[in-house]
Amino acid sequence: MTNPLWGGRFTTSSNDIMKKINESISFDQALYEEDILTSIAHCKMLVNQKIISKYEGQLIIHGLEVIQKQIESGNFEFSTDLEDIHMNIEYSLKKMIGNIAGKLHTARSRNDQIATDLKLWIRKSIKKLEQQLHKLQSTLLNIAENHYDTIMPGFTHLQIAQPVTLGHHLMAYFEMLKRDRSRWQDLYKRMNQCPAGSAALAGTSFPIDRHFIAQELGFDSPTENSIDAVSDRDYIIEFLSNASICIMHLSRLAEEIILWCSYNFKFITLSDNITTGSSIMPQKKNPDAAELIRGKTGRIFSSLNHILIVMKGLPLAYSKDMQEDKEPLFDAERNLILCIEAMNSMLNNITINSENMLKAAEHDYSTATDLADWLVKHINLSFRESHEITGQIVKLAEHNKCKIHELTLIQLQKIIPSITEDVFSVLSAKNSVTSRTSYGGTAPINVLQAIKNGRIYLENTDSLTQ
């Protein structure tokens, strides 16, 4: 038996190997809702344009609604013999209402159908991601507000550099997620043109109304070029690029969580409900959620690479290679949402060990930059001169195995005679962070303002999650 939807010019059916490599229903059934929405909009347009009768349109739409209920209740049987979600639905519709079902495919192709389905699916996914990122940002704000003046070491090269506040550090991730969300919003606007009605690649001779379909499905407009419409997968590439940047941000935070809960840091304690144990070492409490976020980052990166390689050599318009766009897309979206949820759960169940953070912030001469700044302001040295002198003072402290503020004024004056006792006022971690009042700096007063701005941002973007 040849394929009932395209077998007219064939004398034999596909063999089992061809069916196996050709089918996509095992994964594109995830698009059933979008495919039915697209078909209903297309059917309404055909009725409006008098290409099919109103009665035929009613039969088709009712049948599609029944099929959707069957799928959602688990009573629909998908068949690999029918290749994909489009043909499974159309064949089921034909069994339900007869040959009238075949009229649904008038003036369209699976090429423009799948492109429309995918755009609808990505729009829905962007809203889900907006919801999850909004929640994660809210969690970061809450912790930052509780620890706007909690002092911790800031790092460069993973070496203690300068004291900062935990609130300021967490607000850095808030800003990263803001950029992530803006990328999703930009993608939504850029991709919101409707391919439906482009047919296989050249458009159609039927008097269709593409603007109606676009409006019915919530698009801003139809696509401008029918060849581009069916061969474009930029929106998938951009989605996966955005996903890669977003998971990279989560991976950086996950790495810090892994470090911070380790014995050598002890900055935080993770809750038992978001950690795991060891099958051999009874004492272990492992940050597996953070490690899995870090690990899944490579998986999402590879999804982006996958689709870029699929698309790089394809001539216009459609090629079957493009069937390979869906699995990496679905996998990346599913794992990114899971990672955002896991990160939110970790942060909501975290204990901050403030004393350990402060102790660490006071180590390794973290206020040396404050000393250099003081020499510039009060001794009228150039920064390069003060940098050299501060380096000598650090070397002296190392030699004496003490902190800078534990050196005596006499010891300091042997290096720079004009230094005064006032210098000790800038050598504490607390005074260091309090002094960093430049816009965007770590001073607690700045952090409170950043948190206030963050709350306004969340209020203004709440509608994007609806």
UniProtKB/Swiss-Prot annotation:
The reaction(s) this protein catalyses: 2-(N(omega)-L-arginino)succinate = fumarate + L-arginine
Protein location: Cytoplasm
Record Gene3D superfamilies: Fumarase/aspartase (C-terminal domain), Fumarase/aspartase (Central domain), Fumarase/aspartase (N-terminal domain)
Cited InterPro entries: Arg_succ_lyase_C, Argininosuccinate_lyase, Fumarase/histidase_N, Fumarate_lyase_CS, Fumarate_lyase_fam, Fumarate_lyase_N, L-Aspartase-like
UniProt record, GO biological process: arginine biosynthetic process via ornithine; L-arginine biosynthetic process
EC number: 4.3.2.1
Cellular component, GO annotation: cytosol
PROSITE patterns hit by this protein: FUMARATE_LYASES (PS00163)
Domain of life according to the entry: Bacteria
Keyword Lyase: yes
Pathway: Amino-acid biosynthesis; L-arginine biosynthesis; L-arginine from L-ornithine and carbamoyl phosphate: step 3/3
SUPFAM superfamilies for the chain: L-aspartase-like
Stated family: Belongs to the lyase 1 family. Argininosuccinate lyase subfamily.
Protein known as: Argininosuccinate lyase
Name of the gene: argH
